[in-house]
Design a protein with these regions (language model features):
Chain A
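A structural signal for multi-pass alpha-helical bundles of membrane permease subunits
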Residues: 11, 23, 32-326
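Short, Lys/Arg-rich, polar N-terminal cytosolic tail immediately upstream
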Residues: 1-26
Length: 326, 295
């Protein structure tokens, strides 16, 4: 900066250096204004749809169908959340009570409202199992590919790379037939197994990147001290790899939590349906209140949003590492 | 015993360590792909489970003669081109912004992660409600700002539907693209800028002659990666339009879904998904090639 300004002003007549300084000041001011405007625009575009979802979920029926919309609810209500959390009682609407109302008015909380919490539990169980399996198979493999020279090492890395890009929709047809034959349809195990296909390659990849970044000398020192490869991995590398493990856990969890296509194919009843499936079933029913749908949507985005905000640093570094090679 | 003779300790450990991953991926990735290739040579209708004749390339030939398939290809291409172009451009702006040093930068980058984190289904229901023709926020906002004098139909309008779905897609994909572009922005050596400044290159010239060319790999990565995601995207189409109105959003992934799970023709569904997988592999090959060259 210093030399550069010096060079530039040296080339000009003395009288014009003041002019230059003012120009720099205007430029700096403009720079700040552009940054401010840009930041505000980004925040507005990202947050306003979400804010509208939140606002809608607290509106009562009269407000949600008002034209033009009430951006902020006049009389915020918790009735949707009550219906979800206390699925039994007055708030549950059965076929009979529904018939008493005019379905066209849309003032309708579906009888399946009570499925949301079990679906959340299903999503949570599936995601947790997927995370555990990812760590179990991913950590040793990534360590071996990053730190041990063996015949076929490059080949196995390329293999992981290739499996990473298999589109989920290409897996649906064969998976469906296999799972049907195994009798696993409508069982959360079918989701745990198939989600491995879309999470494990990414997991291994991020971990390889991270292990490769750790010095080989650590390994040598551990081996000289009499550690086996396994001990070297668990006692030396794993504690150091914590940040990447956090990233891996988050990605596997969020991917499973958010997954829709495979769950749509393999689940049929509330016994195995995950949150996205129950949510999607609400959106296709025109008689369900919009504010209820938004409330359900709000519940679905709260956990991932909290995770994203709390673990921002790990997520960004993980995505960056995952990006470098594919 | 034989294992011990052929491989030394290192190699045995390595094999032991990678065996679980190879088994898992063999079962959940390699096998299904091979199996769907195999299936694509049979006529499999779940309505007639006992008759599954081997039909050679009939499923593929049938596809190429099917008008719906070509419509789906066209819709997928349109959706992908609109989305990827918008994602790349917007991500470039946001990445340039986040590459500056200013107070509140952390806040902006944290907020930016929100769309990335939420499920596509939630993204879909959020935009479906915004686009709603009766009570939606888009109508409300445009009406209050006097851009329209009566509420309009959005998703139900053939000419708008793909662009509106693309909007919901772009909203969710820009954060990741931004992070990827930011990596390549940060890796531009500052000497380049110094040199350009000493040479008296003005801001815009520095941008076009230093910044953009240095980000080539980043752009490549974003474009190919987002293309791979966009051509197979399913969730938004399922919830927002179900391929409609008419065939306005009838993309390939939707066509695969309809063919497989509504018409119950698993053979031709498998053929189509296999084609989609091949396209994705071709794109991925380019990723590996280009990155392999630059690293």
């Amino acid at each position: 900066m210093q030399t550069d300004r010096h060079l530039q002003s040296a080339g000009r007549a003395p009288g014009r250096s003041i002019n230059y300084r003012r120009r720099a000041e205007i430029f700096r001011w403009l720079h700040r204004a552009v940054i401010l405007a840009g930041s505000l625009a980004v925040m507005l575009v990202v947050l306003s749809p979400v804010a509208w979802l939140v606002s809608s979920s607290f509106q009562n029926e009269a407000e949600i169908v008002s034209v033009p919309p009430h951006w902020i609810p006049d009389q915020p209500t918790l009735k949707n959340f009550k219906a979800i959390f206390a699925a039994t009682g007055d708030e549950t609407v059965t076929y009979e009570t529904r018939n008493k109302q005019d379905p066209a008015s849309g003032d309708y909380i579906p009888s399946t409202a009570g499925n949301l919490l079990p679906a959340m539990a299903n999503s949570f169980i599936v995601a947790t199992l997927v995370v555990i399996l990812n760590l179990l198979v991913g950590i040793p493999a990534a360590y071996a590919m990053a730190k041990i020279r063996f015949y076929g090492r490059n080949g196995s890395i390329y293999f992981i790379l290739t499996t990473r890009v298999i589109p989920d929709i290409a897996l649906v047809v064969p998976f469906f037939l296999v799972i049907k034959n195994l009798g696993l349809l409508d069982h959360i195990l079918s989701l745990v197994i198939t989600y491995l296909a879309i999470t494990v390659p990414f997991t291994v990849f991020i971990l390889i990147q991270y292990f490769e970044g750790l010095p080989d000398e650590l390994d040598k020192a551990a081996r000289v001290d009499g550690c086996s490869r396994f001990q070297s991995l668990t006692r030396v590398f794993l504690p150091l790899a914590m940040p990447s493990l956090v990233a891996v856990i988050l990605f596997a969890f969020l991917t499973s939590w958010n997954e829709f296509l495979l769950a749509l194919m393999f689940t049929q009843t509330a016994a195995s349906q995950t949150l996205p499936i129950v949510l999607a079933s609400f959106t296709s029913d025109f008689t369900i209140s919009f504010s209820f749908i938004n409330a359900a949507g709000l519940l679905a985005i709260v956990p991932p949003v909290i995770v994203a905000i709390v673990f921002e640093r790990y997520i960004v570094s993980g995505l960056t590492a995952g990006a470098v090679k594919g | 015993m034989r294992l011990r003779r052929h491989f030394n300790y290192e190699e045995r450990t390595a094999l032991l360590f990678i065996a679980p991953v190879m088994t898992v991926l063999g079962v959940v990735a390699v096998f299904p792909i091979a199996y769907s290739f195999y299936l694509s040579f049979f006529r499999i209708k779940l309505t007639r489970p006992n008759r599954t004749p081997f039909v050679w390339f009939d499923n593929y030939l049938h596809l190429f003669k099917d008008e719906m398939f070509w419509t789906a290809v066209l819709r997928t291409t349109t959706f992908t081109v609109i989305s990827v172009a918008a994602i790349t451009l917007l991500a470039l702006f946001v990445a340039l912004l986040l590459n500056q040093d200013f107070r509140g930068r952390r806040l902006v980058s944290t907020v930016l992660l929100i769309p990335w984190a939420i499920p596509y289904v939630a993204d879909a229901l959020m935009w479906k409600w915004i686009y709603d023709s009766g009570y939606g926020a888009l109508n409300g906002l445009l009406y209050q700002l006097d851009f329209i004098d009566k509420y309009m139909i959005w998703l139900g309008d053939q000419d708008k539907t793909l662009a509106l779905i693309a909007n919901a897609f772009v909203w969710k994909e820009v954060p990741l693209a931004t992070i990827l572009l930011l990596v390549s922005l940060k890796s531009i050596p500052s000497d380049l800028y110094q040199a350009a400044r000493v040479d008296g290159a003005p801001l815009l010239q520095r941008f076009f002659h230093v910044t953009l060319p240095s980000m080539r790999t980043g752009f490549m990565l974003v474009i190919i990666y987002e293309t791979m995601i966009a051509i197979r995207h399913f969730d938004l189409f399922f919830i927002l339009t179900e391929g409609g109105p008419g065939t306005a959003s009838h993309v390939l992934s939707w066509e695969i879904y309809v063919e497989t799970f509504r018409n119950l023709s698993f053979g031709s569904g498998a053929a189509m998904s296999y084609l989609l997988a091949l396209i994705t592999f071709a794109l991925a090959y380019f990723i590996i090639r280009t990155l392999g060259r630059s690293v």
